[in-house]
Amino acid sequence: MMVKIQDSVYLVTGGGSGLGEATAKLLLTEGARVTIFSRNEYKNEFPHDQVLSVKGDVRSESDVKRALEATIQKFGKLDGVMHCAGVFQNGDELFNMDTQQPGDYTVLTDIVTTNLLGTFNVNRLAIPYFLTNQPDEEGQKGIIINCSSTSGHSPMSSAVAYSTSKAAIIGLSYALAKQLSTLGIRVMDIAPALCDTPMFRRAVGFNQDIANFRNLFPARLIQPIEYANAVKHIIETPMLNGSSYQLDGALRP
């Protein structure tokens, strides 16, 4: 039994660029109505009655509540959350091997609060909105797809806070899927490897040759549309629930 995307309503966090933008565009192309939640105002080419742009921070309870309420006011319901917002920063280390000094606490805190606490915040606030939905033929009332990473499965010593936050998202998604199963709500995470996104390019430095970074096979970076296609596949496949969907070109150890 395939879940229909057309006429469904989704909130996409981090929808202003990268994986989130590609996800929002694909869902809109498939006939969904989408609220794009981003730190920056998003300007789109889709009809006004199909898309809503809300500026805010996933760490802010009031911002997320405002986005959810705006979604209900405009579209009348919420069928799913595609949580793509996240950060990756240079200097992500608990201990600097060169200076023999502790890592920058501000950097570590920003990564963990955005990636992990932002995921907690969006997930917890969205759940009540699913409960008023009429269940489909499978009994589903809603779906959450979080964005983790291959580094959540195999941590990088050069990105300690990022890896830790992504591992926690994997655990959160599975635990939440089990808890919400009796309510008809699915929860998944997608664990991509190296992606060709503005965030990744900023992290490695625009002056470096991006071609030096690649997954095993295909030997290139993941394109955002490939992540979006994985989102579409998960939405349309009801039995995908409580697992980490690894999109990595065999890069994981």
Curated annotation (Swiss-Prot):
Gene Ontology cellular-component annotations: cytosol
Tissue spec. comment: Specifically expressed in male midguts. Expressed at higher level in the anterior midgut of fed males.
The EC number(s) this enzyme carries: 1.1.1.386
Top-level taxon of origin: Eukaryota
GO biological process: pheromone biosynthetic process
GO molecular function, one term: oxidoreductase activity, acting on the CH-OH group of donors, NAD or NADP as acceptor
Cellular localisation: Cytoplasm, Cytosol
Pfam families tied to this protein: adh_short
Principal location class: cytoplasm
Family according to the record: Belongs to the short-chain dehydrogenases/reductases (SDR) family.
Protein name, per record: Ipsdienol dehydrogenase
Lineage of producing organism: Eukaryota, Metazoa, Ecdysozoa, Arthropoda, Hexapoda
